[in-house]
């Protein structure tokens, strides 16, 4: 972030001989800030350890999350504790030489967190809109280059201008004695805010809006394909039965409702992510520009807006993994939980639950989402516990060869509509399975 600047090494404020007494009633504020600091450090440390220790989470997409959690961890360990003392005592109570260093780390860590959020949105954008070419575009070396570029930009926007005094160019106001606040000039604030917030936030809005439109479009495609294939299968079997005109329409409505709910969930997810980002950071950057123009923001209000931006580093390790099913499973294996072993044994003992017709599940492949004929080597599912699979195989055997070749190919990105936050980047080689080809 670009905090309200503080004194440089050339300034000579009247630093206090020792820490002053904290104002009355600050005990509750100190307790709340300590909880925020502890939660930020613990949550980010836990998720970094989770990704490093769980092989299922070691992929290119999660590399950006490690960078995000690292920047947020630095905010919790390096930036928040001095900021808490600064807010409680109303002045800088640490060593004088640490003021400029802390200010530079404040700018760098918060800017790196915002830039990492931008990289995550770009990674999601490439993974959803072109999953088959994702591995060719987002290689580990390119991901490393993007992360290093984000950290380099954050460092250049913090240490270099502050050490060289660029933030004071054209600024006539002297620093307040004993304060550690960055009193930057308007040109510096505009350039730094544009590079570290406004441009990344524009990219985040663009990519997430494109993802939302693609998710809605693909949800409609999957619903129409599933409905059409179900009706084709019922016509091909041609089993004599009493006609029930309301059954097909009810099934179609159920499928359409299910996929509409998935699209709605995607919309809510993006709304939460974008809303959290802008609610925490936009007020601070607006106040930062206003402060550089008119110097009319009180220190207390500016501290509140600054801590609101800090809270983004607290919520990132909670919100982002909350919508990723692989993180939930890995967290259940990583943390000691008395119920987890029994649940895993129960799931392993009843494989028929995973092959039943329970509807499409997020994170599955296209063959598992749509009622496609199974490959010939899946004979293990032909027992009594998987009657749905044998019924699909019978449907495929009854199709005529001429009819099978006339089916249009499935869109290769249809599986992405199931849950665009749980796509596995390790399996981008998704090939459409031709409908109606006999498996024998």
UniProtKB/Swiss-Prot annotation:
Its main location: membrane. Residues 362-371 have a biased composition (Low complexity). Gene3D superfamilies: Rhodopsin 7-helix transmembrane proteins. Changing residue 285 to A: Decreased G-protein coupled receptor activity in response to serotonin. Residues 1-27, 89-96, 168-185, 294-299 are extracellular. One of its GO terms (cellular component) is dendrite. Changing residue 111 to A/T: Decreased G-protein coupled receptor activity in response to serotonin. Disulfide bonds join 99-180. It comes from the Eukaryota. Changing residue 310 to A: Decreased G-protein coupled receptor activity in response to serotonin. Expressed in several human brain regions, most prominently in the caudate nucleus. InterPro entries: 5HT6_rcpt, GPCR_Rhodpsn, GPCR_Rhodpsn_7TM. PROSITE patterns: G_PROTEIN_RECEP_F1_1, G_PROTEIN_RECEP_F1_2. CDD domains: 7tmA_5-HT6. Residues 53-62, 123-142, 210-266, 324-440 are cytoplasmic. It is found in: Cell membrane. Changing residue 188 to A: Decreased G-protein coupled receptor activity in response to serotonin. GO terms for molecular function: G protein-coupled serotonin receptor activity; histamine receptor activity; neurotransmitter receptor activity; serotonin receptor activity. Keywords: Cell membrane, Disulfide bond, G-protein coupled receptor, Membrane, Receptor, Transducer, Transmembrane, Transmembrane helix. Changing residue 106 to A: Abolished G-protein coupled receptor activity in response to serotonin. Serotonin binds at residues 106, 288. It is a multi-pass membrane protein. Specificity for G(s) G alpha proteins is determined by the length of transmembrane regions 5 and 6 (TM5 and TM6). Belongs to the G-protein coupled receptor 1 family. G-protein coupled receptor for 5-hydroxytryptamine (serotonin), a biogenic hormone that functions as a neurotransmitter, a hormone and a mitogen. Also has a high affinity for tricyclic psychotropic drugs. Ligand binding causes a conformation change that triggers signaling via guanine nucleotide-binding proteins (G proteins) and modulates the activity of downstream effectors. HTR6 is coupled to G(s) G alpha proteins and mediates activation of adenylate cyclase activity. Controls pyramidal neurons migration during corticogenesis, through the regulation of CDK5 activity. This is 5-hydroxytryptamine receptor 6. The lineage of its organism: Eukaryota, Metazoa, Chordata, Craniata, Vertebrata.
């Amino acid at each position: 972030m670009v905090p309200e600047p503080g004194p440089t090494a050339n300034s000579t404020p009247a630093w206090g001989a020792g820490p002053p007494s904290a104002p009355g009633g600050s005990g509750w504020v100190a307790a709340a800030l300590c909880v925020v600091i502890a939660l930020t450090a613990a949550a980010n440390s836990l998720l970094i350890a989770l990704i490093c220790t769980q092989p299922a989470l070691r992929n290119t997409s999660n590399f950006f999350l490690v960078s995000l959690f690292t920047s947020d961890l630095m905010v919790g360990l390096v930036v928040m504790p001095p900021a808490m003392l600064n807010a409680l005592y109303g002045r800088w109570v640490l060593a004088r030489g640490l003021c400029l260093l802390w200010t530079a780390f404040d700018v760098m860590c918060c800017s790196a967190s915002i830039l990492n959020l931008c990289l995550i949105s770009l990674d999601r954008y490439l993974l959803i809109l072109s999953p088959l070419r994702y591995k060719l575009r987002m290689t580990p070396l390119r991901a490393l280059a993007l992360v290093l570029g984000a950290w380099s930009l954050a460092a250049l926007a913090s240490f270099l201008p502050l050490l060289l005094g660029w933030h004071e160019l054209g600024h006539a106001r002297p620093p307040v004695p004993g304060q550690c606040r960055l009193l930057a000039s308007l040109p510096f604030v505009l350039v730094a805010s544009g590079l570290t917030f406004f441009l990344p936030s524009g990219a985040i809005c663009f990519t997430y809006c494109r993802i939302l439109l693609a998710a809605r479009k693909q949800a409609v495609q999957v619903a129409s394909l599933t409905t059409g294939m179900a009706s084709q299968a019922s016509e091909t079997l041609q089993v004599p039965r009493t006609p029930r005109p309301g059954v097909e329409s009810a099934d179609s409505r159920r499928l359409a409702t299910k996929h509409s709910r998935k699209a709605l969930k995607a919309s809510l997810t993006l709304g939460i992510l974008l809303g959290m980002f802008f609610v925490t950071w936009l007020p601070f950057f607006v106040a930062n520009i206003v402060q550089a123009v008119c110097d009319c923001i009180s220190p207390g209000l500016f501290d509140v807006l600054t801590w609101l931006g800090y809270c983004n580093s607290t919520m990132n390790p909670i919100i982002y993994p909350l919508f990723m099913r692989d993180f939930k499973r890995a967290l259940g294996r990583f943390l000691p939980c008395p119920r987890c072993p029994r649940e895993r044994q129960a799931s392993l003992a009843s494989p028929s639950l995973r092959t039943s017709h329970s509807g499409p599940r997020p994170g599955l492949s296209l063959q598992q989402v749509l009622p496609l004929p199974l490959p010939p080597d899946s004979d293990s599912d032909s027992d009594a516990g998987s009657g749905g699979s044998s019924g699909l195989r019978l449907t495929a055997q009854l199709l005529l060869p001429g009819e099978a070749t006339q089916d249009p190919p499935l869109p290769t990105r249809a599986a992405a509509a199931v849950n665009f936050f749980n796509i596995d980047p390790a399996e981008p080689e998704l090939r459409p399975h031709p409908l109606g080809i006999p498996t024998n």
